[in-house]
Curated annotation (Swiss-Prot):
PANTHER family: RIBOSOME MATURATION FACTOR RIMM
Domain of life: Bacteria
Lineage: Bacteria, Bacillati, Bacillota, Bacilli, Lactobacillales
Cystine pairings recorded for this chain: none
Organism: Ligilactobacillus salivarius (strain UCC118)
SUPFAM superfamilies cross-referenced by the UniProt entry: PRC-barrel domain (SSF50346), Translation proteins (SSF50447)
Protein name: Ribosome maturation factor RimM
Domain PRC barrel: 94-167
GO cellular component, one term: cytoplasm
Keyword Kinase attached: no
Length: 168
């Protein structure tokens, strides 16, 4: 079974087992809904945890797990990655993609010149920014907008872009 990252536990909060999460999902209100199951890998084993509570605090998602309502029971989870199973993913409408589908795609210009590979997706504001690792050059920051992203081909594992003035 495949698992996909939806967040990272960065710290505890208070003494009642609340965890501070950096979200890696566009759907935190759905992903971290009480009753949902999240998975955490620990020494090669995948453990499941049921969410008891969720709230947003500043730029973080705050959750507690059922049965782990004490700081001493969650201290060891700091730094762990939160994942969902493939079955938990919802179908997206055409033209929308999960981050794991985009990361790793090869990037080509419209005239078929290889530019690099997408290594990360940042969400700084109005639109996502794709970080493209280039060989022998600094990373390229691509705004994920229609003027730049011309075609996403998951079958061919590539993205066709138009390099607008000032992007390179």
């Amino acid at each position: 079974m495949n698992y996909y990252e939806v967040g990272k536990i960065v710290n505890t909060h208070g003494i009642k087992g609340e965890l501070k999460i950096i979200s890696k999902t566009d759907f935190p209100e759905d992903r971290f809904k009480p009753g949902n199951i999240l998975y955490i890998r620990d020494n090669g084993k995948i453990n499941s945890y049921e969410i008891k509570s969720h709230r947003t605090h500043k730029q973080f998602e705050m959750i507690t797990f059922k049965g782990l309502e004490n700081i001493n029971l969650v201290e060891n989870l700091k730094g762990k990655i939160l994942e969902i199973s493939e079955e938990q993913q919802e179908n997206l409408s055409d033209g929308n993609y999960y981050h794991h589908q985009i990361i790793g795609l090869d990037v080509f210009s419209e005239d078929n010149n290889y530019i690099g590979v997408i290594k990360e997706i940042m969400s700084p504001g109005a639109n996502d920014v794709w970080v493209v690792k280039r060989k022998g050059s600094s990373d390229l920051l691509l705004p994920a907008i229609k003027d730049v992203i011309k075609k996403i081909d998951l079958e061919q594992n590539k993205v066709i872009i138009e390099l607008l003035d000032g992007l390179d």
